[in-house]
Amino acid sequence: MKIVADENLAFTDYFFSEFGEIQHRAGRLLTAHDVSDAEALLVRSVTKVNQALIEHSQLKFVGSATIGTDHLDISALQQQDILWSNAPGCNAQAVAEYVITALYHLDSDVFERGQDFTLGIIGLGNVGRRLAKMAALLGWNVIGCDPFVQLPDIHNLSFDDVLQKSDAISVHVPLTHSGSHPTFHLFDQHAFASMPASTILINSARGPVIEEQALIQDIYQTGRKVVLDVFEHEPVISEQLLDVVNLVTPHIAGYSLEGKARGTQMIYDAFCKVFGYEASKKFETQLPVCEPFFQQQDLKQILKAHLRAIYDIAQDDHNLRACVKDGQVDQCAFDQLRKEYPLRREWAAHGGPVA
């Protein structure tokens, strides 16, 4: 069996080498020729799996080690009788920890504010729910907005109410262009006009959920603090945008070792089910032991003392800004940052809590 895999997927050799030949490819550059004689394709969100890519292939299975599926043309896969799977929730814990780290980077007193700090969460799926639980451990007031989810322990308000009542807003929605609640340009000039100037905005979901030019104008007018891990025109990222945003990272919010390994594990499990193999391997056996930072009882004090050692988010910001060339981020350098990213560990690896 020939298996084509994105070169940046974690542990592909460990999980898949026993099944046949693995060809590692740059996901953004994958072509129809690359997959023409493959039976399985393993991708990330940078690969657009569409009719042009798969129509002349022998593919029987496509696995995407991602939460989202907007890069997969589901109807095209179904027309070709190609089974597919993604990895919902694989890096949800990592993203939740990223958001908390970003907030602490912007406000070193945020852990002391307790119920006086209101975190608004847009989208209460795998990531949003985990973030809400982690925020509750820190004593924050949590409100949310999700027309498709009702959770008994989260105040689910209207979108406008969350915009108006939050000290910080974190976005965790899929990218959708149709339906009753499309998320494309959910944050436009009207949304920004509803938000107090002091409200922090964090987007680690999908770039086009925020209208970039409206965001830039809002920051000019309000001085709003903003954190972006995703960008509307990614991998095209303008220097104009970077100049006004407080914290930028190269689409790595979910890049923990556990998150990436878990994503590959999930598509491995699906692969085995499709092809009739026993799924006997577990990613946990491949992870090294970490220093146990969380040995005390006071979570806030532990985070204040060790959060930077666990994840230095400022370094990611510096590295992305260093990729600017001729007015925008160099796309090759952007992809290289992600390819060579030193995967951080989730708090649980250090003895910390899991949502």
UniProtKB/Swiss-Prot annotation:
Enzyme Commission code(s) on record: 1.1.1.290
Source organism superkingdom: Bacteria
A GO molecular function held by the record: 4-phosphoerythronate dehydrogenase activity
Complex and partners: Homodimer.
Binding site for substrate: 45, 66, 255
Keywords associated with the record: Cytoplasm, NAD, Oxidoreductase, Pyridoxine biosynthesis
Residues at the catalytic site: 206, 234, 251
One GO BP annotation of this record: 'de novo' pyridoxal 5'-phosphate biosynthetic process
Gene Ontology cellular-component annotations: cytosol
Protein name (database record): Erythronate-4-phosphate dehydrogenase
Family per similarity comment: Belongs to the D-isomer specific 2-hydroxyacid dehydrogenase family. PdxB subfamily.
Location relative to the cell: Cytoplasm
Listed SUPFAM superfamilies: Formate/glycerate dehydrogenase catalytic domain-like, NAD(P)-binding Rossmann-fold domains
Gene: pdxB
Pathway field: Cofactor biosynthesis; pyridoxine 5'-phosphate biosynthesis; pyridoxine 5'-phosphate from D-erythrose 4-phosphate: step 2/5
Binding site residues for NAD(+): 146, 229, 254
Primary role: Catalyzes the oxidation of erythronate-4-phosphate to 3-hydroxy-2-oxo-4-phosphonooxybutanoate.
Catalysis performed (reactions): 4-phospho-D-erythronate + NAD(+) = (R)-3-hydroxy-2-oxo-4-phosphooxybutanoate + NADH + H(+)
Enzyme class: oxidoreductase
